[in-house]
Every structure is written in structure tokens, then in C-alpha cells.
């Protein structure tokens, strides 16, 4: 824009000086007189004067004033230019220290870093938290859930004991009666046969006090386990593989005393 205005002003000045110079030449030609002897005309200064002005001649236009230094300016400045370059909008106030901020702070920033929500109470010591505490912070660090009662004194216990522990060790079953005085395998139902052992067991009543195939309802007898009780004293004559009576192996031998039924 400045270049265009400068060229337009130069063209206007050149077009205005053209007819003025022609009028001055036409006026100076008939009124020109030879200079007196010994007098020399002055040379033109800076190219603005073509010669000495004619004495007594008319001048159509006096100079309006000295031309501006450096070229014509279309518009004078309205005020001093801003330092540092043109600015489209003047600042409405002092700029914030540290850089532009879109929103001014509503209060003092919390210690420890920016938070999206302002705290509803005093900030907790130890760092930013997303949600403010509804009461005083717990001593020792944040806890998700407050304890409902006093903590256990020694450690976590899944189930409290329902009674006093056993004094010596685990006992599967308490004694329901007095133990027997000694191991008694089986009493004899009668005198043993004189001919050898027999395969069938006695059909009489069970012996009082001896072990039976069913488990005892009281503590084990003092003396140790016994694998198999003896059915009676061995025969006096030694074991015999075959009975003395030939052909009578399926039944009892003749003359065998039977016990009480």
C-alpha cells in the first residue's frame, strides 16, 4: 500500500510540475534580458530552480513549502508506533506471569500439583487425591474402608476358638467307660478236642472282656494291639493235618464235647 501511494504521489507531482515549467518558459522567453557585463547568473540549486527568476515577472504559483524529507507520506501518523511491531489489539490488562491461561485461578493452587476439582477441606498430606476426604485424614496413610472394630491383637484369625484347646493333643473320641483290665482274646468254650484243630468257630456266647471285630467304644486297652486272638490252648498232641477218623472230614469227630449253647 505504501509503495502504491508513493508512486501515485510522484505521478501527481510530475504532472503538476510539467505545465508549470512550460508556463514559466513561455513567460521567461519574451521578458529575458541579457545580463549586465561582469555579472554571471547563479547555477541551479538541487535542480529545483531553472535559473534566476525574471525581475518583475508574474509567478503563477508560489511554493507551498519544503517537500517532506524522504518522500511524500499520504497519511500522517496518528500517534507513536508501538514498540516491537504492530499489534492488532491492545492488551486489556497486565499479562499473567508465566504464560497465558485460559481461566484465572479461583483460589490458591493446592500443594502437590494441579487438581481438576477444588478440595472441599484442607488438602491431605502426601500428594493429590482425586476425591477430597469427607473428614479428617486417617493417620498412617489412606484407607479405603474404615475399620468397624479394633483390629486383632496378633494377626488375622479366620475363626475364633469355640472352647479351650485340648491339653495334650487331638483326641478322636472321649472314653465312654472304664478300660478292661487286660487283653482277653477269647475264653475257651470247653475242653479242646483230643484229635486236632477244627475249622468251624464256636457257636456259644461271646467271651466277656475280649476283643471283638467291632471297634471298641472306649480307649484302647493298655498293652498294645493284638492281630488275632487265640481260640484256645493248642492240643496236647501237636497239629495234625488229617483227623484220625478216615472219611469223616465234613463233620465233627465222634465223642466231641460241645459247650453250653
UniProtKB/Swiss-Prot annotation:
Xref: SMART domains: Pro-rich
Keywords tagged on the record: Repeat, Secreted, Signal
Low complexity: compositionally biased ranges: 238-261
Region (Disordered): 15-261
InterPro entries, sorted: Pro-rich
UniProt key word GTP-binding: no
Signal peptide range: 1-15
Locations listed in the record: Secreted
Compositionally skewed regions (Pro residues) per UniProt: 32-44, 51-237
Entry coiled-coil feature ranges: none
GO cellular component: extracellular region
Name of the featured protein: Proline-rich protein HaeIII subfamily 1
Gene responsible for this protein: Prh1
Amino acid at each position: 500500500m505504501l509503495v502504491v501511494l508513493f508512486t501515485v504521489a510522484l505521478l501527481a507531482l510530475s504532472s503538476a510540475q510539467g505545465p508549470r515549467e512550460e508556463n514559466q518558459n513561455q513567460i521567461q522567453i519574451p521578458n529575458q534580458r541579457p545580463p549586465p557585463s561582469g555579472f554571471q547568473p547563479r547555477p541551479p540549486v538541487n535542480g529545483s530552480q531553472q535559473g534566476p527568476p525574471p525581475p518583475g515577472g508574474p509567478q503563477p504559483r508560489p511554493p507551498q513549502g519544503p517537500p517532506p524529507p524522504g518522500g511524500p507520506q499520504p497519511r500522517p501518523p496518528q500517534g507513536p508506533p508501538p514498540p516491537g511491531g504492530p499489534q492488532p489489539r491492545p492488551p486489556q490488562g497486565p499479562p499473567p506471569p508465566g504464560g497465558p491461561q485460559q481461566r484465572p485461578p479461583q483460589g490458591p493452587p493446592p500443594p502437590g500439583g494441579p487438581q481438576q476439582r477444588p478440595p472441599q477441606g484442607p488438602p491431605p498430606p502426601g500428594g493429590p487425591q482425586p476425591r477430597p476426604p469427607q473428614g479428617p485424614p486417617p493417620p498412617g496413610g489412606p484407607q479405603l474402608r474404615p475399620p468397624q472394630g479394633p483390629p486383632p491383637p496378633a494377626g488375622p484369625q479366620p475363626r475364633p476358638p469355640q472352647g479351650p484347646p485340648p491339653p495334650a493333643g487331638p483326641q478322636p473320641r472321649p472314653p465312654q467307660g472304664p478300660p478292661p483290665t487286660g487283653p482277653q482274646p477269647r475264653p475257651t468254650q470247653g475242653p479242646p478236642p483230643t484229635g486236632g484243630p477244627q475249622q468251624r468257630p464256636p457257636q456259644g456266647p461271646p467271651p466277656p472282656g475280649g476283643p471283638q471285630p467291632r471297634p471298641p467304644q472306649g480307649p484302647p486297652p493298655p498293652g498294645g494291639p493284638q492281630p488275632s486272638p487265640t481260640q484256645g490252648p493248642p492240643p496236647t498232641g501237636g497239629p495234625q493235618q488229617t483227623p484220625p477218623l478216615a472219611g469223616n472230614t465234613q463233620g465233627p469227630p465222634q465223642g466231641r464235647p460241645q459247650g453250653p449253647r
